[in-house]
Amino acid sequence: MISIEQEGLELLQFESTFLDNDVFSFVTTRNQAKIDNPYSSFNLGLYSGGDRDEVLRNLEQLSKVIGISSENIFLPHQAHGVKIGTVDEDFMSLDTDSKAKALNGIDALITNIPFVVIGV
């Protein structure tokens, strides 16, 4: 595992994912979270009970570090089931509210759109 720290943000990469130059994969951490407040560090979960404004700031910070607009970062509202969502041209043409609705209850995402971040 490789740790990359940039602008106070730590990203972890797995060497096995370097095989495809068209895909950049990473994991964010919340290593600085306080024991009594799991949302005190780098929380990206809009649906986890953390402060929404803080999450939006964190998404902007991530956006700057990876060089992709925060509008192209998609994280579903997981239901811990088996539904897989697709971020394709049809999805990208939706307005913001429709995208949020489409991501509700989704447990995994796939895409073929360049410069889009998908995660869980």
Residue positions per predicted region:
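Active-site microenvironment for binding and transforming phosphate-containing groups
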Residues: 1-120
